[in-house]
Swiss-Prot record:
Family stated for the protein in its record: Belongs to the TrbL/VirB6 family.
GO cellular component: plasma membrane
Chain segments annotated as transmembrane: 525-545, 568-588, 614-634, 652-672, 685-705, 776-796
Subcellular location: Cell membrane
Protein name as catalogued: Uncharacterized protein RC0145
Superkingdom to which the source organism belongs: Bacteria
GO biological process: protein secretion by the type IV secretion system
Signal peptide: 1-20
Length: 891
């Protein structure tokens, strides 16, 4: 009775408690109001692990990110992370496309973005020797003549623009997405292109221009003033008709013989006009119409990329007359292209710059024809540089190339590190605080209680994206595994490890064993020599190596360092192999250091107070059969707990078997020398292997069944709501006595005994075939399935013994018996446990039998025996309605 009261109190405590101010308000609540007060008991979810995930952006590298999880000391902390969301940063280039009459093709200045330095750099650009000791480091020394310096570098300039000096070009791969946008000329020399200190001698950190005219120097200005990204291609006649129609200042001649004259020879470096003339001329002309050809009349300018051809691997992606797409929202012009094949990106034009002047103006010719600076200056000053047509201008572009499908470089991936940190409070840790490194599949026991923090460190600057991190920590109890492993199993295994080592060392040091080994070696070598001399043995390389190895192993066996050698390179594979396989097979565990930590989540599930409370509620439903389902479930759980005990015992027996076999290793190792005794050595190896494989296979089957059991248990247990458990109805019926009196009534203050009632609908024609998880039919079939799976787990040891025997060919049999059954040490241990607990089981079942006899069957008067009299022998242990002879037969 006390147990029953305790269970009722347990169920009531599981209900939602009332507020402190309303602790006694239920006393004045009506019977119907109690239902809303106590509510329902829901089926619990098995949440022994607190899981979560977080995406950490590489842009926040080095900064600690909160997971929101709290961990407990000594319990499992598991972290898995992936770099699948990491991609390469788009390759960025600044490109200056400029028309210069001294080069047969347009000049293309390329600057590559360096993510490490966060700046654009002109790689391979021919640079001058600069004076870093001056007040403005990086400038040309004032005592040097720019023109004289540039004359000696003309060949370098030619090589640079012809890409013959190894300078980098823009490479596009198949599948790359290319975006080219027009930008202002100032972007090419943007602030993120640092001048100091990283690019001290990189003269492309500022405009290439000089107040002194130098025909052999490079320039980046096209003398269009504020009119960026425009190209002029017009005959001298069209230009002169606008700016010097009377041919009085900068023009001469008429018709096709018209020439444009320039007093400072700036035209030969792409600067045909002074600033004032440019402003005047650009104010007179307009943009050329769409699809306008070369040398349009009247003179006009080309914009939006017209006049420039862009190719990738020889394939044109933007034609001469094609314009960039104008974005109305961003007011920018761009071209978007996905490469179908790879190659080098070229910026070129079909418009020819040759014949602009009557004399040779190509820098390539100058570098070959002039050996000294004086003759070159004389050539420039004496010749007439009047232009037959004007072709000048520039485009400034930014090129971005990316491909989400491209894998990041292995070096970049290896540089990405993840760290975790546990703090006692939720305050954001300082970035200078170092954390613990985390592998891709990381598991450990939390070193302390606290909050979990994660961060990414050391990513390379050329990658971007998010590191995806999944984390989980165990929140359940660990008392069972602590008792089983730390309190029982670990002391046993440690003792047997020590026993195995001591026994082995004593055996090896024993003079009889040493003499046996020496005698065996002597016989082996003698027999081998005689067989070889008489020709009875065909000697091969494999045979020689095999025999030498055998001799070396046995010879090393009797040395003092025998245990250290064999334990390190051989025995540890078996002693540590069991723990290794068990640890790697187990998925969910409470502790990394406790190999039986996987039992804690299982016990958390099957010892959950809510589960047993709902089962007790079902036990009270005798009238509708739910009590039978609850009894099946409880008995199944007890059977399953026994199966868990078998797994534990199986592990211990396997480990003991391994240590015993290892302690006898010297005998079996000696036996491998001779063919007649080698079978004993082979069987010894097979036995060791079987002891390692058996607990592993047993655990695999056990965990698979546990997954199914968890699902079935949640279907057997149903929610329970506060309702009338036993209705109280008072009535009187005298019609059977001929008195016409028949009435019944309920007490308004107590219509029934209230308690939790399972929420299960009655079986009807409408739901008998539906897949409703709460129908009696579904509950009954699920309970039978649950019972079947528990019985299956109970029989796993026998089944695994058969499987391991077939795999390792180790099938020890009894000496006698028709079938020579395989011995089962685990089964023998369980039978001993049964025999010890049998009286307890009988004592527990006796009240149940009495309850069935007196309450359910209403057998108040026991049946009489055939000889007369009432049989009442062993009232609490035997049924009174069964004859003594029948009872003995059943036993």
């Amino acid at each position: 009775m006390k147990i029953l009261k305790s269970l009722v109190l347990l169920v009531l405590f599981m209900a939602m408690p009332a507020k402190a101010d309303d602790a006694f308000s239920w006393m004045s609540t009506s019977f119907g109001g109690l239902k809303s007060l106590f509510g329902c008991l829901e089926v619990p979810e098995f949440t022994s692990f607190q899981e979560g995930n977080i995406g950490i952006s590489l842009s926040t590298a080095g900064i600690w990110q909160s997971t929101g999880n709290t961990v407990q000391k000594g319990k499992l902390l598991k972290i898995n992370w992936s770099t699948s969301g990491i991609t390469l940063e788009p390759r960025k280039y600044l490109v200056l496309y400029r028309i210069d009459p001294r080069f047969s093709m347009p000049q293309v200045f390329i600057k590559t973005y360096n993510y490490s330095k966060l700046q654009f750099e002109a790689l391979g650009f021919p640079r001058f020797v600069t004076d870093n000791n001056s007040e403005t480091p990086g400038t040309i020394p004032p005592d040097k003549d720019l023109d004289a310096l540039s004359f000696t570098k003309m060949s370098d300039f030619v090589k640079y623009f012809n890409y013959s000096n190894g300078n980098s070009r823009i490479e596009v791969k198949a599948g790359d997405v290319v975006n080219i946008s027009l930008v202002g000329k100032d972007n090419f020399f943007s602030p993120n292109t640092l001048k100091l200190p990283n690019t001290v001698d990189n003269i492309l950190t500022q405009e290439l221009d000089s107040s002194i005219f130098a025909a052999s120097a490079l320039y980046t200005q096209s003398n269009l003033g504020d009119f960026d990204n425009r190209i002029i291609y017009s005959s001298a006649e069209q230009v002169c008709n606008m700016i010097d129609k009377e041919r009085k200042s900068v023009c001469s001649g008429t018709g096709t013989a018209t020439k444009y004259k320039n007093t400072d020879n700036g035209v030969i470096v792409g600067k045909p006009m002074i600033t004032g003339a440019v402003q005047y001329f650009m104010g007179l002309i307009k943009a050329c119409p769409a699809n306008a050809g070369i040398n349009t009349s009247p003179a006009c300018y080309y914009d939006q990329g017209r006049g420039m051809i862009i190719k990738v691997g020889g394939q044109v992606i933007k034609g001469q007359d094609q314009s960039f797409v104008n974005s109305g929202s961003t007011q920018s012009s761009f071209i978007y292209y996905q490469a179908t094949s790879g190659g080098i990106m070229d910026f070129t034009s079909d418009w020819q710059v040759s014949n602009m002047f009557s004399n040779s103006v190509l820098m390539n010719d100058w570098s070959r024809n002039f050996s000294n600076y004086a003759s070159f200056v004389d050539y420039i000053n004496k010749n007439d540089w009047s232009a037959n047509f004007l072709y000048f201008g520039c485009y400034s572009m930014i090129v971005e190339i990316g491909n989400g499908a491209n894998l990041i470089n292995p070096d970049d991936q290896q540089n990405i590190k993840l760290e975790y940190l546990i703090t006692s409070d939720g305050t954001l840790p300082d970035p200078s605080v170092r954390g613990m490194p985390v592998d891709y599949n990381f598991a450990t026991d939390a070193p302390q209680d606290g909050y979990l923090w994660l961060r990414v460190v050391n990513p390379n600057s050329n990658i971007q994206g998010v590191v995806s991190v999944n984390y989980a920590n165990y929140t359940g109890t660990t008392w069972f595994s602590d008792i089983i492993y730390n309190g029982a199993i670990k002391p046993i295994t440690d003792q047997f490890r020590t026993f195995s080592q001591n026994f082995y060392i004593k055996l090896v040091k024993n003079s009889a064993v040493q003499n046996l080994a020496k005698t065996a070696l002597t016989l082996y070598v003698t027999i081998f020599g005689l067989m070889f001399v008489t020709g009875a043995l065909k000697l091969t390389a494999v045979e020689v190596i095999t025999r030498i190895c055998k001799i070396a192993i046995v010879a090393f066996l009797i040395r003092e360092e025998s245990w250290s050698f064999f334990n390190t390179y051989f025995f540890s594979a078996f002693t540590d192999g069991i723990d290794f396989f068990v640890t790697n097979v187990v998925g969910a565990t409470s502790s990394r250091s406790n190999i039986f930590g996987f039992i804690d989540p299982i016990f958390d599930k099957y010892t959950n107070g809510r589960i047993w409370g709902l089962l007790f509620i079902e036990l009270l439903q005798i009238h509708n059969g739910l009590a039978f389902i609850a009894i099946i479930t409880i008995y199944s759980l007890i059977t399953y707990f026994r199966a868990i005990l078998e797994v534990i015992i199986g592990y211990v027996i396997a480990f003991i078997g391994v240590t015993v076999m290892i302690s006898l290793a010297p005998f079996f190792i000696i036996l491998m020398l001779f063919e007649k005794t080698k079978s004993l050595f082979d069987n010894w190896i097979s036995t060791l292997l079987s002891y390692v494989v058996q607990p592993t296979i047993l655990l695999i089957f056990f965990l698979l069944i546990d997954q199914v059991l968890s699902e079935q248990l949640l279907k057997v247990v149903v929610r329970a709501c506060w309702d009338t458990l036993i209705p109280i109805k008072i009535g009187l019926d005298l019609t059977n006595l001929g008195i016409p009196i028949h009435f019944s009534f309920t007490l308004p203050f107590l219509p029934g005994i209230p308690f939790y009632v399972p929420d299960v609908p009655e079986i009807s024609s409408s739901n008998i075939l539906t897949n409703n998880a709460n129908t009696f039919l579904v509950l009954f079939t699920t309970a039978l399935l649950f019972y079947s799976y528990c019985l299956m787990s109970y029989s796993l040891v026998t089944f695994v013994n058969i499987v391991v025997g077939m795999l390792t060919n180790v099938t020890p049999a009894r000496i006698s018996g028709n079938y020579q059954e395989r011995s089962d040490p685990v089964g023998a241990v369980m039978q001993d446990i049964d025999s010890v607990t049998k009286p307890i089981k009988k004592a527990a079942m006796a009240p149940a039998r009495v309850f069935k006899d007196k309450i359910i069957d209403q057998n108040y008067k026991a049946r009489k025996a055939e000889v007369g009299g009432e049989f009442t022998n062993k009232f609490l242990a035997e049924r009174n309605d069964v004859k003594k002879e029948e009872g003995e037969k059943k036993e």
